[in-house]
Amino acid sequence: MPSIHVMSPTLASQVAAGEVVERPASVVKELVENSLDAGAKFVRVEIRRGGVGMIKVTDDGSGMSRADAELCTKRHATSKLSSLEELFEITHLGFRGEALPSIASVSRFKLCTRQQQDLEGWEIRIDGGLEHEPRSSGVSPGTAIEVADLFYNTPARRKFLKSAETEASHVEHQIRLHALAYPQVRFAYKRDDQLVFDLPATADLRVRISALTDAATAAALIPIETTIGPGISITGFLLPLSEARRTRKGQYVFMNTRPVEDQLINRAIRDGYGGFPTGLHPALFLYMEVEPALVDVNVHPAKKEVRFRRSADVVNTIVEAIANTLQKHARQEIHAAAAPEPERTLPPAHSTTAPYGEIPARSTNPGSAFPAAARPAPASSAAQPPLSSSAKQSHGAVPPPTLRAIPLKQVPATQGKLDFHRQEDEETARNAHENAALERDASAGFSYLGTLRQQFALFETPEGLVLMHPKAARERIIFERLRARREAPMPSQQLLDPVVLDLDPRDFAVIRQFAPHFDQAGMAVTPFGQNTIRIESIPALLELENARAFLLELVDRLTQSEFSRNAKRVAYETFIGEFARKSAWRERISPHRAPAILKDLLACEVPYCTPGGKPTLVNYSVPEIKRKFGLQA
């Protein structure tokens, strides 16, 4: 008897589902793509229990006949391909004919559909691959697909799913991607019978982006200069450096209305920005139209990655579009800086358009918004003022933002304040004693020589010369002292008027999951509605305008780490790292403190760099110095 056998159709579909149906968001992706391919103008998505309990996608598209409805659940059945040549000129989102049978094999599946010209519709039911007899149904024109009890017959797959909160955040992110790709389509999303959003169709991409982002992001949008290359055109919006993230959560890239994640495109984006800080990723909304014959979308199971036939043309066009846009925007800011700043007035307290006042937008100063390589040199060394109101409004009005905040009034005193700044007389006495001890300790091997430009401390060692940056050293010292007393609460400042922020659903899920750990780290954060949080206190020394950026950086660090085990440590160390940096760099350090600081630094667990990775000590060996003078080492 042969050991090789042909899998049953049901088993084959369940195996294929491993690639097609990774999580509830994968189901939503496939179903919404089918709706869009059917020409829908309104797509409604409903989920329960993160999508595991139920997913329902309803559209007003073309619908299907009974024959097509029965065939669409068969493997490799599709209306979008009839020859190999068509594969290389595909314009549809889906084309393999694997999604519906794979989904139906691991769930309780129901499809109701009706064509506009038909008097009645049809209902198809499949339970874990077991098909029921089709029956007529009185439904509206279009298609409605309901997927219940996802992975009920493959419990091993269900174990790999995250919490309902996390899975729901991925579902919402997937819907947002399609809503950004198709602003001309109305999208509605309900979660556990609660309406999350209902986005009306619009011809203005900025309106759709503004509806799905917070006010700070919407106000900072920079239109990309439409750029046309060989077989490709680029448009969209850029965001300044202040909106950069440690992950690519802020990057939305679409190719022929298809959300894509491609390393080639990522490199082109970085090259376009030029001089971008290591470890950060620029935020943008990039829309590419590429001739179908010049791109292969059949290279990834989920069709997230693509392969370009003329990749150099794609890279050059993206780089040109981004670089030209940044340069033009920088010139506009420099020009606006020459004009007098218009007088600004605050809206009255009873205003109906902004009842609580808007959170101030981030600075768009060209000195802070973009890398130096992406903007022309200023005419003088004077700081450039922010972009004027008239320049900001040159691209059309932005609809009322969803991000609101009550004006901040900080409590003057901080809670749990730690005093790292010693009185000068105490420092003098202690340093004199420690300096003498350091000089008597021959094993220390460091002889203090003095300072360089009142900024660096110089020490002679048996191996050569050591330069220490006292403030960077103090940053490391303060960080490790705070880390050693982790049980103590982080110094914080209470906000009389809490700040309310709207967030990306994935960021909101992380914050909601680990909010208790934030308290010890000095930031009290509580959920405040769908994808909205309220900040009630922030770490001492943290300015309010940096609270959002600081919170998102913490989310990125939690996402990058194994936060299921280390969330408390990551949250605490992120906050104390920021506290140590601000505390150290605000200190006034006199030169005679250098030896004592060095001694404290060398007692640290990691003395050679700050928590952020910047060096605290730089060593020049004697052989290296001799080589500089042309002497034999």
From Swiss-Prot:
Decide whether keyword DNA repair is in the record. Answer: yes
- Show the segment(s) annotated as Disordered: 338-407
Q: Name one GO cellular component term.
A: mismatch repair complex
Q: GO terms for biological process?
A: mismatch repair
* Keyword terms of this UniProt record: DNA damage, DNA repair
Query: Pfam families under this entry?
Result: DNA_mis_repair, HATPase_c_3, MutL_C
The answer on whether this UniProt entry bears the keyword Nucleotide-binding reads: no
Query: Briefly, what is this protein's role?
Result: This protein is involved in the repair of mismatches in DNA. It is required for dam-dependent methyl-directed DNA mismatch repair. May act as a 'molecular matchmaker', a protein that promotes the formation of a stable complex between two or more DNA-binding proteins in an ATP-dependent manner without itself being part of a final effector complex.
Q: What protein name is recorded for this chain?
A: DNA mismatch repair protein MutL
What's the encoding gene here?
mutL
